[in-house]
Amino acid sequence: MRLIPLKNDQQVAKWAASYIAQRINQFKPSAERPFVLGLPTGGTPLQTYQELIKLYQAGEVSFKYVVTFNMDEYVGLAQDHPESYHSFMHNNFFKHIDIQAQNINILDGNTDDHQQECHRYEEKIKYYGKIHLFMGGVGIDGHIAFNEPASSLGSRTRIKTLTEDTLIANSRFFNNDISQVPKYALTIGVATLLDAEEIMLLITGYNKALALQAGVEGSVNHLWTVSALQLHERSIIVCDEPATQELKVKTVKYFTQLEAQEIASVC
């Protein structure tokens, strides 16, 4: 596992966006051989999307031959609802770049057959071979996508009941009214994520410090989904200084020295 400890969330966004653009450009995607990118929603990746839009506008990256798969979607929320993840992705990223509509994949939370929709999603990922780079974030309890604590580390795309902590955290998007937050979501599984060729998690803020500590220094544990990254041969966590508050000083020092060149690139 790589840990890139940066100063603040702006540096995290710049580094992550630059890394994604670099990976796409190195791949040299085409219509016959697209780059497959996994994407999250939520507050943490917003700045990264803004930085990616800037890189696109500067002509430094194109998404014409990029296929995307999103991590999750609420169940029962209309796709045009302002807080659906379809709306989030369109408004904050897709409408600002040159991605082709047919290359965008987001779970359908309004289908009558959730099991079939989840199976279809897994099969479509297999159709493309694999996800080359999956960017994600974590919740304060260490969940990735909607793989809440005690999710199986071998899980696949499925419907999940959201925990009270997640409902409370997400209520900020619903006028702080927890009763308006959908209680269920369709989500990729932990094993689906681990199938990716490379995983990059963004972890920022004091409230994510325990999750970062569990993911980096803790044992692999189904109560902390983030810890599953320890099993992946190409995983990166990009974090800011506030998120490192629960890490041992020697851990931060070790990775700061190890990743000095990467840290210098955004300072």
Swiss-Prot record:
Its biological purpose = Catalyzes the reversible isomerization-deamination of glucosamine 6-phosphate (GlcN6P) to form fructose 6-phosphate (Fru6P) and ammonium ion.
Q: Which CDD domains does this entry report, sorted A to Z?
A: GlcN6P_deaminase
InterPro entries the record matches: Glc/Gal-6P_isomerase, Glucosamine6P_isomerase, Glucosamine6P_isomerase_CS, NagB/RpiA_transferase-like
Source organism, top-level taxon:
Bacteria
Supply the name of the protein. Answer: Glucosamine-6-phosphate deaminase
The protein's UniProt keywords, in alphabetical order, are: Allosteric enzyme, Carbohydrate metabolism, Hydrolase
Q: In which pathway does it act?
A: Amino-sugar metabolism; N-acetylneuraminate degradation; D-fructose 6-phosphate from N-acetylneuraminate: step 5/5
UniProt lists the family membership as follows: Belongs to the glucosamine/galactosamine-6-phosphate isomerase family. NagB subfamily.
Q: Active-site residues? A: D72, D141, H143, E148
Q: Name one GO cellular component term.
A: cytoplasm
